[in-house]
């Protein structure tokens, strides 16, 4: 696995890609961000279209806020996005292979043709999201939260199924919807 850039160098990379203003160096939030958090905010993607095979691999961006955005053909391979908020988004052809999404809130999003190969999804809340043509091969999912109805439609290994925190209900709708 390639080495991840630290947070400061990840911000430099985001500036190079035009995703951060040159004078902006957002603080790293101390907890999972919410849609109604007050300033200062960490790095966030809100009501944005990210596409054109954008490469955001090998970055350290924990506690990032993604909201009401469309993420098409973007690579987050081997990126650290743990404790991020990925609610209310459309992810199409996105690659999270080897990424750390542990303890992230990923509810109420659409994931189509998304790779989670060898990703860390431990403790992530995936309820109210749909996963079509997604690969979870070798992904860790200890205590990941899914409904039994979702699980029936997903290709998961027996080990993954044993580690998931299965729920019968969708739970509360995430904020920001």
Language-model features: locations:
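Tandem repeat scaffolds
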Residues: 1-177
